[in-house]
Every structure is written in structure tokens, then in C-alpha cells.
Amino acid sequence: MAAKIRRDDEVIVLTGKDKGKRGKVKNVLSASKVIVEGINLVKKHQKPVPALNQPGGIVEKEAAIQVSNLAIFNAATGKADRVGFRFEDGKKVRFFKSNSETIK
């Protein structure tokens, strides 16, 4: 099955502590998990590594979030949208279901 949410897509969070926030997909880990820029921030306790001259401390980083908790953001309507697939010139492309506009 083709991925409905891909890298560099702008998405909006539907549920959880970051509900309503928007961000860009940085990395797709699997079919069900992605990392979104500035969303689902967690604090990681990091030990110092003297060999690499790396200080220790508490570091904030993005954790993975389930794709089911996200929706693609349609800039034309300013809302979350659903994704469909169709063939254009022999190629499978994604489109927004609300206005049938092709996703770039």
C-alpha cells in the first residue's frame, strides 16, 4: 500500500498533548510511525562523552508519533484533509479529497 503521509509533508496533530499543532515530517520510520518537526518533544538524559567532547545533560528531541494521530494539512482550505490516490499520465499521484487538488 502506498504511503499517505510522506517526508516533507505538512501535517496537523489530531490527538494527544500536541493536538492542533502543525509541523513538517522529518522522517518516516515505518508504515505507522513518523517524526514531525517540533512535535512530540521528549526529554532525554544524556551521559557526557569526553572522547567526543560532548557534554551531558537533559536534551529535548522529537519522538516518533503514530500516523493515525496525524492528518495532512491542506494549505488551500487551511484545514486537515484526507488523502486519495489516482492515476495521472500513467503515474499514481496523491490528491486532497476535499478539493481534488494534487499534492506536490
UniProtKB/Swiss-Prot annotation:
One of its GO terms (cellular component) is ribosome. Pfam families: KOW, ribosomal_L24. One of its GO terms (biological process) is translation. Keywords: Ribonucleoprotein, Ribosomal protein, RNA-binding, rRNA-binding. InterPro entries: KOW, Rib_uL2_dom2, Ribosomal_uL24, Ribosomal_uL24_CS, Ribosomal_uL24_KOW, Translation_prot_SH3-like_sf. GO terms for molecular function: rRNA binding; structural constituent of ribosome. The keyword RNA-binding applies. NCBIfam families: rplX_bact. Belongs to the universal ribosomal protein uL24 family. Part of the 50S ribosomal subunit. One of two assembly initiator proteins, it binds directly to the 5'-end of the 23S rRNA, where it nucleates assembly of the 50S subunit. One of the proteins that surrounds the polypeptide exit tunnel on the outside of the subunit. This is Large ribosomal subunit protein uL24. It comes from Pectobacterium atrosepticum (strain SCRI 1043 / ATCC BAA-672). The lineage of its organism: Bacteria, Pseudomonadati, Pseudomonadota, Gammaproteobacteria, Enterobacterales.
